[in-house]
Curated annotation (Swiss-Prot):
It comes from Bacillus cereus (strain AH187). It holds the Pfam family YidD. GO terms for cellular component: plasma membrane. HAMAP family: UPF0161_YidD. It comes from the Bacteria. It is found in: Cell membrane. InterPro entries: Membr_insert_effic_factor_YidD. Could be involved in insertion of integral membrane proteins into the membrane. Belongs to the UPF0161 family. This is Putative membrane protein insertion efficiency factor. Keywords: Cell membrane, Membrane.
Length: 78
């Protein structure tokens, strides 16, 4: 499933993005953020993080540096 989402983003980067002017307000760009989110966190959390990021990418948000959060260790240490 993760590879399907990565393929969609890569298709966008290769065929759609070059035809539009650069408008992303963030670094890394939303498509690069999405790739990294899927690679680090898998399909479900990567999809959630990418959707949240795309919803923030609008003219009323200041943008800036917004890296993908690190994967947290889910194990409880005792």
């Amino acid at each position: 499933m993760k590879q399907i989402f990565i393929g969609i983003i890569r298709f966008y980067q290769k065929f759609i993005s070059p035809m539009t002017p650069p408008t992303c307000r963030f670094y890394p760009t939303c498509s690069h953020y999405g790739l990294e989110a899927f690679q680090k966190h898998g399909a479900l959390k990567g999809f959630w993080l990418t959707c949240k990021r795309i919803l923030k990418c609008h003219p009323f948000h200041p943008g800036g540096f917004d890296p993908v959060p690190d994967k947290k260790d889910d194990k409880v240490h005792s």
